[in-house]
Design a protein with these regions (language model features):
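Extended, folded cores of ATP/NTP-driven motor/assembly subunits in large transport
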Residues: 1-378
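P-loop NTPase motor domains
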Residues: 23, 30-49, 56, 60, ...
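Hydrophobic anchor at the beta1->P-loop junction of P-loop NTPases
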Residues: 415
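Conserved lysine of the Walker
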Residues: 423
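Hydrophobic positions on the alpha1 helix immediately C-terminal to the Walker A/P-loop
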Residues: 426
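Post-Walker A helix-loop "phosphate-sensing" segment adjacent to the P-loop in P-loop NTPases
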Residues: 433-443
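A short helix-turn-beta junction within AAA+ P-loop NTPase domains corresponding to the substrate/partner-engaging
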Residues: 459-463, 673-686
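Conserved P-loop NTPase
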Residues: 701-756
């Protein structure tokens, strides 16, 4: 093995390995399946007779501790450790429902004959580039393994019973006099019996697949890989030279015709009809002609396939059960799984991803027959970074979905769903998860006063803004880091234009003259503060109102008159300097009591306050999560929608992770500009949708009818997750017996049950 990933398997045979990820094949509708199948056929046809390749599907059981470590939330020695322990326990119980106990990986190993490493390298590199490009065309993520990664993979396959890490350095080879084999070899190998083998404390058995079925099914490989036990499936494929293949088939047809003539002569001599020939002969002749036609005119190639299945277990009894289960799957598709008696060692070595086949049992198949073993089943999303968040279980495989939105190109997100679909619950669960596993600040715009209990439980701050409240937010607040530009006033002016449009603008919004006047006045009222930026010099809405009154244009007087009720009238809640200290890590702006007139203005002012916080946090290299409930309210007016879209675009660069929560998809797509919110959101958590919204979303997000069924009349907590280019159906059955569930549920039945339990406890006391 060489550091760059090239392995010299024999004196003149060199191989490399590429690891590839899964894509959703079984979830797709028939047209998409056909497209993937055709793409896979083209992929296989790339390999000529000089390239041998091996597809390896490795499902190895991980110890419980391995997964426990990957999902455990580290304790931080504060009063929330009890909640962290409970959340970790919830994740472990969810994990037990699926088969995440298996680590499933897929590899393609390819090799060429060459006189030397120097001659092999350029060929392998060219083939590697072509393979990665072919995977990319299929929408499959793939990467080449270096020497260390290939050795780690082999070490894992040869030490299935030991959780010990792989320890190796290229610098150790020369001083020790050892080879790479010494660092990956298991403690013991045993090939005493002809029907099984031992590796370490595990026992295994290698079988080969006899393909007897006249037609193959694309579910067969998927069914093997769905087995809930350790398993290695290895497919060695060798392309046959096209000219040789056609010559061989023509020769066979000639032989069959010769035999047919002999049978006809025999029939004439015996005195019966010469058309009566053995049925097998007629069948073989027809099949051979059909095969020749496929090779000559249907872009098919001829391949030789060796299909090996390695079952591994802790003891002989379990191994017998696993082998029986694998055999049953083969029989279901009219094939047979046969043990490689007295060839267990050769079989196991051939199953290792080295691209070297020692089993000379090959079956000739055309491109489409080999391609029917589609190597794609169901995509999984299990990221084990320290900021990965729980999103439910994969509805197809029952495996945990854990994702880190910050790894996306654009972490902005949307939570969409009809009332009662679990929208608010999902948002609260994510907020709690973010609080427990990250150091990010969390800000919530809460138009319906739903988030208070959760925020208070997390020792956060609820800022109640209403006409009767004494909590004030100044919409004129300006942080000197407000914008990337040298002049922070440009973006602030945009915000004030949006605010004035909500207050003044009619059906057509602000007129160009009105926008000019407002912009002029904004620059004037900030002049003193920008020359001496002290808090007491921060302008308020009344300063803007007075400046407008000083202008000569009649439009200025019109705008000032419209502002009057918000300055000196009964709606003057936003005509004060900010008196709330929003430095708490979790802050919720409760604007429920603002009333219809002020609610949209309140949401816009909150958005501006959040932007101020984001700019401050950016200086401290800290992320800010912002959750906007009832987001559609901000998108109805053109200017506020434009400002929201602008902020949505800017958030990513400034370390912000915004999440819009809404049931009104139509408002999200009401204009081309607002569609930018979808285009700038790589994370969409979609719950049950109304029929009109489903059609809009299907078109916007290119969702197939089959995928759409997961958000049609779906139960609470069920839907589709869009994470970058990945689309997964999910189910979130959050345990109801947890403290966290009681804090975040909004269902009246659950809340009344809690009240009843509390009353019982009081009576008992």
């Amino acid at each position: 093995m060489y550091p760059d990933g090239v392995c010299r398997v024999t004196d003149n045979y060199y191989t490399k390995t590429v690891q590839f990820q899964d894509i959703n094949y079984q979830l797709n509708q028939n047209e998409d399946k056909t497209a993937i199948f055709d793409g896979w056929c083209d992929f296989l046809n790339y390999f000529d007779s000089s390239i041998r390749f091996q597809l390896s599907f490795i499902n190895l059981s991980a110890t419980r501790d391995t997964y426990a470590r990957r999902i455990a939330i580290p304790l931080q020695g504060d009063c929330f450790d009890k909640l962290r322990t409970e959340y970790t326990g919830m994740l472990q119980s969810q994990l037990a429902r699926g088969n995440n106990g298996l680590i499933k990986t897929k590899y393609l190993t390819f090799g060429v004959e060459a006189d030397s490493l120097k001659a092999a390298k350029p060929r392998l590199e060219r083939i590697e580039t072509d393979i990665l490009n072919n995977f990319r065309r299929l929408g499959v993520q793939a990467e080449s393994l270096n020497g260390m990664e290939r050795l780690r993979l082999l070490h894992g396959m040869l030490h299935m019973d030991e959780p010990q890490p792989f320890r190796f350095s290229w610098d150790w080879l020369a001083p020790s006099g050892l080879s790479v084999k010494d660092f990956i070899a298991p403690g013991a190998f045993e090939f005493k019996t002809g029907s099984s083998f031992g590796v370490g404390s595990k026992t295994g058995c290698v079988s080969f697949l006899q393909i007897l079925a006249p037609e193959l099914n694309d579910r067969m490989l998927a069914d093997f890989l769905d087995m809930e036990s350790s398993l290695i499936v290895s497919m060695h494929v060798q392309s046959v030279d096209q000219v040789k293949a056609i010559k061989t088939i023509k020769r066979k047809i000639t032989d069959l015709q010769k035999m047919t003539i002999e049978e006809q002569k025999k029939a004439v001599r015996s005195g019966y009809d010469m058309d009566i020939i053995p049925s097998d002969l007629a069948t073989y002749g027809t099949e051979a002609k059909k095969l020749l036609q496929e090779l000559q005119s249907r872009n098919e190639r001829m391949f030789l396939l060796t299909f090996l299945v390695v079952n591994v277990a802790d003891n002989k009894q379990r191994l017998g059960n696993n082998v029986f289960q694998a055999g049953s799957i083969a029989q279901k598709y009219n094939c047979q799984l046969t043990r490689l008696d007295f060839q267990q060692e050769e079989g196991f070595m051939s199953a290792l991803p080295l691209g070297y086949n020692q089993i000379e049992i090959q079956r000739g198949l055309t491109t489409s027959s080999v391609a029917i073993f589609v190597p794609f089943t169901t995509q999984e999303l299990f990221q084990d970074g320290k900021e990965a968040l729980y999103c439910g279980l994969n509805a197809l495989s029952n495996n945990l979905i854990m994702v880190d939105r910050k790894l996306l190109k654009n972490p902005n997100g949307l939570i969409l769903g009809t009332p009662g679909s679990g929208k608010s619950f999902s948002a609260k669960r994510e907020i709690a998860n973010v609080f427990l596993v990250t150091n990010d600040d969390i800000i919530i715009c809460d138009p319906e006063a739903e988030y208070g209990p959760l925020v208070e439980h997390l020792h956060g701050q609820v800022v109640k803004i209403s006409p009767t409240s004494t909590d004030y937010l100044n919409p004129m607040d300006l942080n000197l880091n407000y914008s990337d530009d040298e002049n922070p006033l440009s973006l602030k002016s945009d915000f004030i234009l949006s605010l004035c449009e909500l207050i003044v603008g009619g059906k057509d919004g602000l007129m160009p003259v009105e926008k000019t006047i407002i912009d002029r006045c904004v620059r004037s009222v900030y002049r003193e503060y920008l020359s001496d930026p002290r808090p007491e010099k921060m302008p308020i809405l009344e300063d803007l109102y007075n400046e407008l009154r000083r202008q000569d244009e009649k439009e200025a007087q019109y705008i000032a008159t419209a502002l009057e009720i918000y300055v000196t009238g009964s709606l003057n809640v936003f005509n004060h300097r900010s008196n709330v200290n929003i430095e708490n890590r979790v802050v919720s702006f409760d604007i429920k009591e603002l009333g219809k007139q002020l609610k949209k203005i309140g949401m816009l002012v909150v958005q501006d306050a959040v932007w101020n916080r984001v700019t401050i946090n950016r200086e401290q290299r800290k992320s800010t999560r912002y959750y906007i409930d009832e987001m559609h309210l901000l998108l109805k007016e053109e200017q506020t929608a434009a400002y929201t879209v602008e902020i949505w675009k800017r958030f990513r660069k400034w370390g912000g992770v915004p999440t819009g929560i809404t049931q009104n998809v139509k408002d999200l797509l009401s204009s081309r500009e607002v569609e930018n919110i979808f285009e700038n959101s790589d994370y969409v958590y979609m719950l049950n949708q109304a029929s009109g919204d489903r059609q809009i979303l299907a078109k916007q997000l290119n969702i197939s009818p089959h995928q759409l069924s997961y958000v049609t009349q779906s139960a609470e907590g069920e839907g589709l997750l869009f994470y970058g280019s990945v689309i997964l159906p999910f189910v979130d059955r959050f345990p109801k017996d947890t403290e966290l569930y009681k804090i975040i549920t909004t269902k009246l039945s659950d809340l009344s049950e809690q009240t009843g339990e509390e009353a019982k406890d009081a009576i008992t006391v």
